[in-house]
Amino acid sequence: MTPSRITILAPGLIGGSVALAATRAFPKAKIILWTRRSESIPALRSALPKAEIGTEPSLIAGSDLVILAAPPSALVPLAQNILPHLAPATLVTDVSSIKGSVEKSLAPLFQKKARWIGSHPMAGSEISGFAAARHDLFQNAPVILTPTPTTSSDTLQDATSFWKSLGAHVLTMSPTEHDTQVAQISHLPHCVATALVLTAGTRALPLAGSGYRDTTRIAAGPAELWSEILLENRSDVLTTLKEFQGSITRLAHAIEQKDAASLKNILQEAAQIRRSLSHS
């Protein structure tokens, strides 16, 4: 896909990074930025001087690609506002880390109005907002596309082509499978990092080295967004938390029983799995 007019709605960290990356990947394309807050326009214009920026949903008219970069709770009203300005050939996607509920909400709205497919870039930072956006955020990062049985092959192909143009590694799975796996690989780590920070408290912070900092970095993420994500995906998150409790219990039991062999096996099993990530 070589889009000529790309609109990003609500450009924060992810949406802003899409805009910066797309400017480089598609130098001939017109970049459109929609923001609900007029006070954010100067910063957007400073970073993307050639972009068209405004607060009116009509900005998206004529776009062949539209990226919804708002939080999950804002997606439905945002989608409803842009519907009159879409064309049947327009490719519309999002960047939400939840897919089941988003698919159920948005797919019916876009039916016959545009070509819809869900996207989730597995890239980000504990720092939110457009100021943290980077043109290279998606380089070698996984982006998950969540087609359904009604998704056309052209829609999947065009979405895949777009994200690959930004440097991403594209994976496909169903919205349900996405939510299950992301609960394990993204949502659980945020819960664990939060629990670790709360358990350690502040007394030992002067001793914190790279291990603690690396392990807890994501706990500094925006609480409002993460509470929304965890509650939206609560079924899969709760299942994963229970599995994690089982792993903690297994580890604690080996330590309590002074079972060096079992403890070593647990640590080696985890180390082997983690090392496989380095080679993938």
Where are these regions (language model features)?
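Glycine-rich, N-terminal phosphate-binding loop of Rossmann-like dinucleotide-binding domains
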Residues: A69-P71, S96, P147, A195
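NAD(P)+-binding Rossmann beta1-loop-alpha1 motif at the extreme N-terminus of oxidoreductases
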Residues: M1-P57, A61
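Interdomain hinge/lid region at the active-site interface
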Residues: R203-I273
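Rossmann-like NAD(P)(H) cofactor-binding subdomain of soluble oxidoreductases
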Residues: L78-A131
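Rossmann-like NAD(P)-binding element
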Residues: S58-L86, T90-L91
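Residues at the starts of beta-strands that form the adenosine-phosphate
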Residues: R5, K30, R115, P142, ...
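Internal alpha-helical scaffold of NAD(P)-dependent oxidoreductase catalytic cores
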Residues: H135-I218
